[in-house]
Structure formats: C-alpha cells, structure tokens
C-alpha cells in the first residue's frame, strides 16, 4: 500500500520536519534519488529512478514500516486514520486541478472513477466547477453519484464525446483530467477537451 498513515516508533532527532516519537504521520510514497536532472530541478515525480511504495518496493501493508524521515508529514489532532489515508489521493487530485487552472463554472471531465478520479470530482465541485466522471464500470459510477458527482458517463454504453457535447452545450470540457492511466483514455482526452481547454495527466 502507498496510501498509509502511522505512529512514529523511532526517528532521528534532527529530522527536518520536527517529527517526534509518538507523532501520527502520513508518508510521501514516492521515493526519488535526489541526484538526477528532474530531482535537481525540483521535479521529483519525474525521477529517473522513481520507486513507489506498494508498487516497486514493499509498502504499508505491514505492522511496521521504515521510511525516510524527511518524507513524513505530521497529521493534525482530530484527523481520523481513514482521513489521513486519503491524504495521498487528495494531494494528487488537488495538484491536477491546480495545474489545469480549473475555475468555478467550468466543466471538468475526469476519466477514471477510481480513488483519484472520485476525489478529483469532489474537489472540482468544491471549487464550483461541474464534474463529469467517465468510467467503464457502472458500480463505480453509481458510487460517484452517491457522493454527489453531478454527471457520470459509462463510456462503454454511451458515446462520451456526444454526451459531453450535450452537457456543455457544445463547448466540451474546459479541463480534462486523465486518472486511469489507460492508453486509450489518454488519447481520448483530445476528443473531450474544448478549444483553448486544458488537459492534465
């Protein structure tokens, strides 16, 4: 797992975040080298030797886990463990929304109704935008509707281009967020975005 939180059992006293034994923390799950060109310019997400917890290295599905001290973030008092575990999907969704410059009143098409896509839809609506969530799995879309997502499209049952054209009055989506990682979905972003619109991957 890479969406995890825990209690610090041991940590160097001189860590940069001022974390102490007993603190509740979330982790930055993306382990980067710190030396390659992307790392040197602050784009650690593009590290040439990037390792992701739970994907490339063992993650948080264990009672104890060792992680670099400078990649721990203290969580506030009163935050539940369940809320803390959502820090990673929330930050990814927020980053995509911010990078795309989403504004209130705009339409945001989000491809993929997994954790990132669902949170992105809720964030878009919290910003006052209209979220349009696309997926092939009806159960995910039903769950999205139960969370209050304004529009859902089952891409396997209806034409997303025509449906988004209908929803937006012909303008198409002002921002398209691709949250599935599937090659056909990445290509489809170009069909869903408005003229002068933005795509975030």
Predicted features, each with a name:
Residues 100, 142, 147-201:
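Glycine-rich cofactor phosphate-binding loops and adjacent beta1-alpha1 units
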Residues 31-111:
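NAD(P)H dinucleotide-binding glycine-rich loop of Rossmann-like/cofactor-binding domains
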Residues 1-37, 76-78:
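Glycine-rich beta-strand-centered segment in the early N-terminal region that forms part
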Residues 3-7, 24, 38, 64, ...:
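Residue-level marker of beta-strand positions
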Residues 79-158, 162:
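Mid-domain Rossmann-like dinucleotide-binding core that forms the NAD(H)/NADP(H) cofactor-binding site
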Residues 25, 108, 172, 176:
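Receiver (REC) domain switch-region micro-motif
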Residues 9, 132, 200:
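Conserved beta-strand positions in the Rossmann-like core of class I SAM-dependent methyltransferases
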């Amino acid at each position: 797992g890479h969406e995890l939180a825990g209690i610090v059992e041991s940590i160097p006293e001189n860590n940069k975040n001022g974390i102490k034994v007993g603190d509740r923390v979330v982790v930055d799950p993306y382990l980067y080298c710190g030396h390659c060109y992307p790392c040197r310019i602050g784009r650690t997400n593009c590290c040439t030797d990037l390792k992701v917890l739970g994907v490339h290295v063992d993650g948080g599905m264990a009672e104890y886990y060792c992680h670099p001290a400078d990649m721990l973030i203290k969580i506030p008092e009163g935050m539940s463990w369940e809320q803390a575990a959502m820090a990673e999907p929330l930050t990814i969704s927020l980053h995509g929304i911010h990078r795309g410059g989403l504004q209130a009143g705009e339409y945001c098409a989000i491809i993929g109704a997994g954790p990132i896509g669902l949170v992105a839809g809720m964030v878009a609506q919290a910003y006052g935008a209209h979220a349009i969530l696309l997926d092939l799995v009806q159960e995910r879309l039903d769950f999205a509707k139960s969370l209050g997502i304004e529009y859902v499209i089952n891409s396997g049952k209806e034409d997303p281009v025509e449906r988004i054209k209908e929803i937006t009055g012909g303008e198409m989506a002002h921002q398209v967020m691709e949250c599935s990682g599937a090659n056909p979905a990445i290509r489809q972003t170009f069909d869903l975005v408005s003229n002068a619109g933005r795509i975030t991957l």
